[in-house]
C-alpha cells in the first residue's frame, strides 16, 4: 500500500489515469497492457451526471476548504493484491474497498478503480479527506490531519486484520514496504523488477557462484518471498 495526496490542479491527472476512459490518451505508465484495460472496473458508486473530478470539486465545496493552491483536495491509496494471495481476486478488492470506504466515509469516495491491465493487480482508492474539527464542531477538508503519522502507522495492521477475518486466509499487507513506510509506486515497481530478475537468474543458473552473486543484490525484506518462489528448484539460500 502507498498513499499520495493531490492538490485541486493535480487531481485531474490521477483521476484520468484511474478511469482510463480516453482511448486516445497517452499515459505516462508504459507498463499498461491496453489489451486488458477492458478488465478494469470501478467499485465506487457512480456520480450521476458528474465526472469524478466534478464530484470531488462539489464535495470539497460542501465543507470548509482553504483556497490556497497548495492545499490537497484528494488522497489516493494504492492497494496492491499480495503476490502470495491465492484467494478470490474480486472478493479481495471488494473487501479492501469496504474497509477503506468505512474508514474514510462512503460519501467521500471519488473512485475506486481496480486495475488488471498492469504488472500487479491493484486498486486506486481516491477520496476527499474530510475530517471533523472537534474544536470548531464542523467538518472540513484537511489531508494533513486525515493522513497523519498515527494513521499511516495504524492502517496497515488494521486492514490486514480486517481482510483476514473477512477472507478467512492469510493476507500479507504487512510486508517489507510497510515496515519502511509508504513507498512510491515507482519504488515498489523497481523492487518488483529486482525480485523477478533474481528469480529468473536463480532458476536458469542454479550454481553456487550465481546464487551468491544474485543474493547479494536482493534487499533483505525480499529474500523470503524469493526463497518461496524458487523452492521447487531445490536451491538452498542463506
Where are the regions a protein language model picked out?
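N-terminal nicking endonuclease/strand-transfer module with a His-rich metal-binding environment
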Residues: 1-235
Amino acid at each position: 500500500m502507498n498513499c499520495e495526496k493531490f492538490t485541486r490542479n493535480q487531481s485531474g491527472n490521477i483521476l484520468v489515469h484511474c478511469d482510463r476512459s480516453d482511448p486516445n490518451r497517452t499515459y505516462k505508465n508504459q507498463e499498461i497492457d491496453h489489451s486488458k484495460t477492458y478488465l478494469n472496473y470501478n467499485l465506487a458508486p457512480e456520480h450521476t451526471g458528474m465526472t469524478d473530478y466534478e464530484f470531488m470539486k462539489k464535495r470539497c465545496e460542501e465543507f470548509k476548504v482553504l483556497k490556497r493552491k497548495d492545499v490537497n483536495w484528494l488522497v489516493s491509496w494504492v492497494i496492491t493484491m499480495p503476490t502470495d494471495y491465492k484467494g478470490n481476486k474480486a472478493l479481495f478488492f471488494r473487501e479492501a474497498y469496504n474497509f477503506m470506504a468505512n474508514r474514510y466515509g462512503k460519501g467521500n469516495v471519488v473512485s475506486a478503480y481496480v486495475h488488471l491491465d498492469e504488472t500487479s493487480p491493484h486498486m486506486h482508492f481516491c477520496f476527499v479527506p474530510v475530517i471533523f474539527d472537534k474544536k470548531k464542531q464542523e467538518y472540513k477538508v484537511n489531508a494533513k490531519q486525515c493522513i497523519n503519522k498515527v494513521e499511516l502507522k495504524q492502517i496497515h495492521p488494521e486492514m490486514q486484520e480486517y481482510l483476514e477475518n473477512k477472507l478467512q486466509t492469510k493476507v500479507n499487507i504487512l510486508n517489507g514496504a510497510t515496515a519502511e513506510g509508504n513507498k512510491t509506486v515507482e519504488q515498489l515497481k523497481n523492487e518488483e523488477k529486482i525480485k523477478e530478475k533474481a528469480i529468473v537468474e536463480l532458476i536458469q543458473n542454479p550454481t553456487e557462484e550465481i546464487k551468491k552473486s544474485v543474493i547479494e543484490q536482493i534487499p533483505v525484506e525480499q529474500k523470503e518471498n524469493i526463497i518461496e518462489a524458487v523452492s521447487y528448484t531445490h536451491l538452498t539460500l542463506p
